[in-house]
Amino acid sequence: MNGTRLFELDNRIRVVHKRLRHSRIVHCGIMINAGTRDENKLNNGVAHFIEHAAFNGTERRKAYHILNRVETVGGELNAFTDKEKIFFYATALKTYAERVLELLVDIAFNATFPQKEMLKEKRVIHEEIDMYEDMPEESLF
């Protein structure tokens, strides 16, 4: 597979790894195998909500510290949701690979979803929905 390795850990987490020797950056991601396809009338929007809310704190970090952990070294942290998955990802210099991966694991497995932040996230998601509804080309996909 083009130098790409796929293996499964003892806890059944699958890992895809590809090393690019010439590159000085690392791009890491954690994919949660659940998306909008798994929603129904009772939990409609929950995947997108989790994507947003996971950045609001973990057992070890407040929201500010999550973003700061990658941005202070010139990296980028983001996420997206689609029908198949929730994907948390980060890009940084290779030197910071361990820092980036540790942060992604913390977000994916230790998010706390602080109650006081949830209403803010709900508003942000509604603003995103309004933005997409103003873009007719989005309805084609």
What are these regions (language model features)?
Residues 59, 66-141:
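Acidic/histidine-enriched segments that form metal/cofactor-coordinating
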